[in-house]
């Protein structure tokens, strides 16, 4: 799918919860522990802990969302580095705020009762937690409706 010519209509940052912030400290703790072991003379212990710090830090940096974006023909979840998840409007049924418990692909960054669910026509829904759920859903559904209207007018299905 090529989305490079799309216009960005709205974007929101994820709101990070306390638990996730504490989890993000783990690589730093491993790094400090590795440094402490090295300075205390335990080089092998330091070298054993260092890869864990680097790998866990890299994984966290790559998979945690940076931005949730609404384009004129798709939604994009920007992850670390060059990675992102793009869902075209042709694959989306609706975007809604929900509190239901269900099996979803999660790009949530906090534990909360209400989250935004991107309901797909086929496959698993996607759960996200933007800073402002209401505004994100409003913009996403407005863009989805406009895209559907344009598709009907041009005869593309």
Please provide the spans of the model-predicted regions.
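Hydrophobic alpha-helical transmembrane segments
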Residues: 41-53
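Conserved beta-hairpin
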Residues: 52-89
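Cytosol-/stroma-facing membrane-proximal "stalk/adaptor" domains immediately downstream
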Residues: 145-157
